Each structure stands twice: as C-alpha cells, then as structure tokens.
Amino acid sequence: MNLAYIPSPTFSKFEIGPFTIHMYAICILIGICVAVWILTTRWKRYGGTFDQILDTTLVTVPCALVGARLYHCITTPADYFPPTGNLVNILKVWEGGMAIFGGISVGTLVAFLWCRHKHYPFAIFADAIAPALPVAQAIGRLGNWFNQELYGWPTTLPWGLKLNDADAIGKSEICYSGAQCPDYRTTLFHPTFLYEMIWNLIGAALIIYLGHKLADRLKAGQQFAMYLMWYGLGRTWIENVRINYSTVILGLRTNMWTAIIVFVLGCILFVVLYQYGPDPKAQARGLAAVTADELERQSIEEERLRQKKQAKRTK
C-alpha cells in the first residue's frame, strides 16, 4: 500500500435543520458564481453591463443544467431507463451525473437565441465566457471528488486516489463488466477529476493570455473556439483513463466520440472565423449602442414611475 495518496472525503452532504445540503450541488453553484464574475468582468470591457449578464444567466444556466443532466442520462441508459433502470433516477441530481457536453450544447444554443432576442453580439459574448467555462468546470469537478466518482484505472503513483466507500467501487467499468472488483482498501486510482481540473485551469489561463497577446489579430468568437479545441483535446485523453461505466460505440466511449467532435468543431470554427469572423471592435461598438439604448429606456421608465408615485402623493 502506498504511503502517499489523495484521500477521499468522508462525507458528501450535511444537514441544516430539515434540509440536506449536497457538496456536489455546492461545487456546481460556486463554479457558476465564479464563472458569472469572470464573464461579467470581461463583458463590461466590451461595453456591456452586469444586468445584461444577470438576465442572460438566469435564462441560460437552468437550461444548461437540464441539458447536462439529460445528456448524462441518455448516454448511460442502464441506470435511468427500463428494464434495468428507473425513470425516477433522472431527478436524483444530487447523486451526481451532469455531463458538461450536454450543458455546453444546450447552454450555447439558448445563449445564442437570447443574444439574438436582446440584440447582443453573440460572438463577443462567446469570447467573454470562454475562460469562465473551464474555471466553472474545474470547480464543479470537486463535486465528483466528494461523490467518489469519475476516477480512473488503478495506479501506484503517489497522487493516487484512495476510496473509503465500497459503493464507490461499484461505479467502475471493472465491476459493470463482471470482472472482480479491486479491493478499495488497498487499491489507489487515477484522480481523473483532478486531471481535468488542472487541464481546465491551464486552458482558462491560456485563453486569457492569448486573447490579450493576440487581441489585434483574433476575430470575435475565436477565443470560444480555443475553448472548444482545448477541452475537446483534454477530454479525449482523460476518457482513456476513466473507468466509470459508459456506453461504447465502435470501441470508443460515448464521451470520447463527443470530445473528438467538439475538438474538430473547434478547429473548423477557429479557421472559419479567421477568414470570415466579425471584428471584435465593431461588435463592441454594437454592444455599446445597445447598452446605451437600454440604459436610456431604463431611465425613462424610472422617471415615469417616479412621476406616477409623486402624482399619487399629491392626490
């Protein structure tokens, strides 16, 4: 048994009165809050406001979470659909099971439609959120640590993960395939959640650095394309290490196929935007005009309400 290892938490939830608080949910919420802060900071530099981000977040985040959950359930049908699963399990989000690919897909679509509705330039919105997404994902991965899930193959490395719950072993591909499960008391596993955390944080730093360094050369939307390429590439090799149950298609795990597609789409998007993408400065001017119009209408509405209240007092 290795003397050096990463321990697993001894709890995944706690009670406050009649309420049960799950660490998985807390990690996701913290990740969302940090992402909104990063997004707001970058959006304001383009000429936007916090209120615009707040409205967009309130519309987009719930849809993205639903998309993340549904993608996970659809790609691991044995746990959620008859005859082996139970549809009620789809609602048990506190037990884990939020697939980022589903969140990215649905969240991007909803954000695009919302930006069109509000006349916000979507390309610079995508750039603004590009480094925020991997940071949120990195924080969210801590929830997998608390749930003792999404670990990798057995290892003897000094940063191997030590499980403290026999049920955690049952989440591995080894047990699903009928092979004898390793003894969780003497076996360490690759902490793939940690690998993805580090990969995502490096990616966020690179996007911010390259976005600043190449500001005069990048087209609007290319920073988001960088995110797709980076995450797709990283998830491809991480999926090779993970041993949680997954549907296999043509010898590859479902998430590996999705990661490859995301990487390829990111490459195509980067090249297309390089040739035909909009100018970030022009998009920023467009956003500034929309913001000015919104603020003017807001000021007029506030003045109307003020006069209405004043009229009531004089009666």
Swiss-Prot record:
GO BP: lipoprotein biosynthetic process
UniProt membrane topology term: Multi-pass membrane protein
EC number of this enzyme: 2.5.1.145
Biological or metabolic pathway of the protein: Protein modification; lipoprotein biosynthesis (diacylglyceryl transfer)
Record's signal peptide: none
GO cellular component, one term: plasma membrane
GO MF assignments: phosphatidylglycerol-prolipoprotein diacylglyceryl transferase activity
Organism in which the protein naturally occurs: Bifidobacterium longum subsp. infantis (strain ATCC 15697 / DSM 20088 / JCM 1222 / NCTC 11817 / S12)
Main subcellular location: membrane
Protein name as annotated: Phosphatidylglycerol--prolipoprotein diacylglyceryl transferase
Pfam family, one: LGT
Binding site for a 1,2-diacyl-sn-glycero-3-phospho-(1'-sn-glycerol): 141
TM ranges: 19-39, 93-113, 188-208, 256-276
Keywords per UniProt: Cell membrane, Membrane, Transferase, Transmembrane, Transmembrane helix
Homology family: Belongs to the Lgt family.
Location within or outside the cell: Cell membrane
Enzyme class: transferase
Role summary: Catalyzes the transfer of the diacylglyceryl group from phosphatidylglycerol to the sulfhydryl group of the N-terminal cysteine of a prolipoprotein, the first step in the formation of mature lipoproteins.
